[in-house]
Structure formats: structure tokens, C-alpha cells
Design a protein with these regions (language model features):
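Mid-domain Rossmann-like dinucleotide-binding core that forms the NAD(H)/NADP(H) cofactor-binding site
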Residues: 122-197
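Glycine-rich phosphate-binding loop and adjacent beta-alpha segment
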Residues: 218-283, 325-326
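A structural motif shared across PLP-dependent enzymes of the aminotransferase-like
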Residues: 98-111
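Helix N-cap at the beta1-alpha1 junction of Rossmann-like dinucleotide-binding domains, i.e.
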Residues: 181-183, 214, 237
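C-terminal capping/lid region of NAD(P)-dependent oxidoreductase domains
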Residues: 3-4, 254, 279-296, 304-326
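A short acidic, Gly/Pro-enriched loop at the edge of an enzyme's catalytic core
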Residues: 200-207
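Glycine-rich beta-strand-centered segment in the early N-terminal region that forms part
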Residues: 25-41, 49, 53-101
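Short acidic-hydrophobic, aromatic-tinged amphipathic segments that line or gate anion-handling sites
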Residues: 193-198, 297-302
């Protein structure tokens, strides 16, 4: 097979991305060549990377599986790619697959790095898989119980996926807390409740914080009941965070716990591989209600401008921004 060229999105330096051409290697017997149809922007992490806010202490731990280059740049970053296998083992030829690959028109990876989409999962929706994997891991860390009152502070893509999953547990009452009233519509489509911070229900058995801002963390601590868990799912990068541990934090014996998808949650780690976890996440994407989380789409050629817009705005209500390839 003649080697092909591909285009990839590179962060040249903080605040500036561009499309670059590169030549693909010929796939070996245990590799596949994938033609990309869609990719998803993981807004929280990718905009933080775009702004050059990865702390020096985290540059190795925050590497994406198929990242090229290094932080702060030039770096090729991303981890939510969906496409069609056009070369490789016969069992995979023509199959629709998900891969933790950056934004690129075509790529060659080991065959074990792609995951065949389950029946009933559209390619366009599969870009949510990486964020849903984060949500799955968060709930493993949080360990909600039947009948729990659960508050999710921060109605971004990950927070809403956490709420959607938790809302499927029998007896659990889930409320998404966000400063943007416009989030009410999407929460209702996902079958969970909504409140602005000042009207949020307190005495929550479990609070999951995913807003990425210190005010949201303060709200999360305020809503927690006696001896409740507050799970911190936000990643702040270089941002210094003011954690309000005064007031009733100690008298209520609250547990503030972190969760990060880079490791399988402790309770599951001895039995679950990362591959099993992502395949579970893909299998959960059959619900059409999740399409409400993909609020925007743009062609691949527009990706550098899209990243700049998302990274430069805190008021933009975009959830998952899908990139489409032709």
C-alpha cells in the first residue's frame, strides 16, 4: 500500500493552533489505518492545554495516549476520534471504531488501540466516549448508593454525563447545579433535575463537583450533608484554588476526594483494565438523549479557530463540540 498523507491539528504555542501535513507509515500486520469521520473536543482539558496551563509537575502524567510533541507546544493533543478502518486485519476492515487519538484526518495505530462501536451507537455520538469514561470512573470513585440524594455542581459535558449515569440508579434523586439557567433544558432531556446555586437542595448524600471554578467547589461543600463525600472531578491546571475549609466543613466531617480518569478507580482496579472500561463506556452510548450533549459541530478546517474561541470564553455554553471530517 502506498503511504498516504494526513492533516493533523497541532498546538504550535499557547494560544495558537494550526493544521499540519504528515506522511503516514504503512501499517504492519498488527496495525490498522483509520480514516477519521468525527472527533470530539474535550473542552475542559483541551482548552487548558491550548492556553498553556499544564503545570510542569504534570507534563508526563497528562500526556494523551497518542500525543506527539510536548507541553506547552508544539504538541498534537486530543483523545476522542471516531472513524472507519480502511487497512488492517480482515476482522476490522470496514468497521466503525473509536480511538484515543488526537484530531487528525487519518492515522495508523496498533489494532488493539481501536474499539469497535457496539450496535446502536452512531459514529457521531461516539465522540462522547472519552468523557463518558471519565464519568464512569468518577461514579466508581464516588460509590453512590441506592436512594442517595446526589448533587452534581457544574453542568458541563462531564458533569451532565455523571448526572445522567447517577439518575439511572433506582431511588436516586439527582440535581445538576449550574449558574447558567439555559442548562435546565438539557438536564430535563437527560431525566435529571436542575437548580441554580442559590436554589439548590442541600443535605446531599453525595456531591460531585465538575464546574472547574472555586465558586463551584464552595457550593459543593455547602450542599453536602453530614459525613457526605464531595468528589472533586475538576482539573485546574496551574490555577490556584481557594478551598473553603472553614465553617461547618469539619463539624460535618465531610470527605473531599479527587477523581481522575488516568487510573482506573481504586475499587475496580484489580479487575478492570482501561480497555474494559472504555468498552463499557461505548456500550452505554445507545441512548439518543445523549445527543443533547453535542451542541456544536464544525469542519476539521475550522478546528484551530474553534479551539481559540472555546479557550477564550468562560461564558460560552458549548458542551461537546464535534469536529466533522470529509
Amino acid at each position: 500500500m502506498t503511504a498516504l498523507s494526513a492533516q493533523a491539528c497541532w498546538l504550535v504555542e499557547p494560544g495558537r493552533a494550526e493544521l499540519r501535513s504528515e506522511t503516514l507509515p504503512k501499517p504492519t500486520a498488527d496495525q490498522v489505518q483509520v480514516r477519521t469521520l468525527h472527533s470530539g473536543i474535550s473542552r475542559g482539558t483541551e482548552t487548558l492545554v491550548f492556553r498553556g496551563e499544564v503545570p510542569a509537575s504534570e507534563v508526563e502524567r497528562m500526556r494523551a495516549p497518542f500525543q506527539s510533541g510536548d507541553f506547552p507546544g508544539p504538541v498534537k493533543y486530543g483523545y476522542s476520534s471516531v472513524g472507519i478502518v480502511e487497512a488492517g486485519p480482515a476482522a476490522l476492515l470496514g468497521r466503525s471504531v473509536f480511538c484515543l487519538f488526537p484530531h487528525q484526518t487519518r492515522y495508523v495505530v496498533p489494532a488493539v488501540a481501536v474499539h469497535v462501536l457496539p450496535d446502536g451507537v452512531p459514529l457521531a455520538r461516539a465522540v462522547l466516549a472519552a468523557n463518558l469514561e471519565t464519568a464512569v470512573n468518577a461514579l466508581w470513585d464516588a460509590a453512590p448508593r441506592l436512594g442517595d440524594r446526589i448533587s452534581v455542581v457544574g453542568g458541563g459535558t462531564v458533569g451532565l454525563l455523571v448526572a445522567w449515569l447517577a439518575g439511572r440508579m433506582p431511588g436516586c434523586v439527582v440535581e445538576v447545579v449550574d449558574t447558567h439557567v439555559a442548562r435546565r433544558e438539557v438536564t430535563e432531556r437527560l431525566g435529571v433535575n436542575f437548580a441554580v446555586p442559590e436554589a439548590a437542595r442541600d443535605e446531599a448524600d453525595l456531591v460531585i463537583h465538575a464546574s472547574g471554578c472555586t465558586e463551584g467547589l464552595a457550593t459543593a461543600l455547602r450542599l453536602a450533608a453530614f459525613e457526605a463525600i464531595v468528589l472533586e472531578l475538576s482539573w485546574y491546571g496551574k490555577l490556584a484554588v481557594n478551598v473553603p475549609l472553614g465553617g461547618a466543613f469539619h463539624s460535618r466531617r465531610l470527605l473531599l476526594k479527587s477523581s481522575q480518569v488516568g487510573q482506573v478507580a481504586t475499587a475496580q482496579r484489580s479487575r478492570w483494565s482501561r480497555r474494559r472500561r472504555i468498552e463499557l463506556s461505548l456500550s452505554l452510548l445507545t441512548d439518543p438523549a445523549l445527543d443533547a450533549l453535542i451542541t456544536d459541530a464544525a469542519p476539521f478546517a475550522a478546528l484551530p479557530a474553534v479551539l481559540a474561541r472555546l479557550a477564550g470564553s468562560t461564558s460560552d455554553l458549548t458542551l461537546c463540540h464535534r469536529i466533522d471530517y470529509t
